[in-house]
Amino acid sequence: MLTQLSIFWFDFLKGTVANHLITADVGAYPAPLSEYREQLEGRSMLVARAEVFPIECVARGYLAGSGWKEYQQTGEVCGVKLPAGLKESDRLPEPIFTPATKAESGHDINISERETADRIGEEATRRLKELTLAIYSRAAEYADARGIIIADTKFEFGVKDGQIIMVDEALTPDSSRFWPKETYAPGRSQQSFDKQYVRDYLETLDWNKQPPGPALPDSVVARTSEKYLEAYRLLTGHSIADFGSRLADSKTT
């Protein structure tokens, strides 16, 4: 589902930013992969190689997660000063760019725009910020009309043939906070269509938050899957089972 939702967004956003997707049609993959068709169908992409920036590009439209925690302590998020008196889950006056490091293991670490520029340069930082906020704004407007608030999300970018392109995944429940619009109310944590359900379950356990993580009960896995599939349906207008037929249709048009 994550792969298929990314494919949907890559297509939707292609007028805003180029991406690394070549095809999701396994029949068009290199010949040596044909014997793995059953395993690859619907859950893989053939992508272009890119030199990836070592930065997670986060866009926040609402105050939640690590941003909310940092705001409570400093009144800022990643060096961005915010108005006083905001509540958890409040909509921000405007979306903000809050980059983070790409950790090899453990959690990513929030950094400022200045620290980002020190790592990758002023011009690259300016362009990544511009792309991140443009993508977020377009996707958030689309999702809002379909009953989903994209509270925040993160992107990765790379360089191919001198052009900055989007890579990895795009606007999935793993990389974003998706809230149902009909139940949204600031001042508390929100119901969600993302991995927050798993986070909330893990918070009930006596666990030091170091790998390996505890096993998840089947009930938590099943409920998380339901939430992810509902997000996919609302955003794309299709069930996950429709993917194969729509891919076939796209090859004949």
What is the predicted function of each stretch?
Residues A64-S66, Q163-I164, T172-P173:
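Short, charged/polar surface micro-motifs in flexible loops or helix N-caps
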Residues A170-A231:
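C-terminal helix-cap and adjacent tail motif
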Residues M1-A100, N208-A215, S219-L247, T253:
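Active-site loop/lid in soluble adenylation, ligation, and acyl-transfer enzymes
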Residues S89-E122:
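A short mid-domain helix/strand-loop element embedded in enzyme catalytic domains
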Residues Q4, E123, R127-A134, F193, ...:
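Generic recognition of stable, solvent-exposed alpha-helical segments in well-folded globular domains
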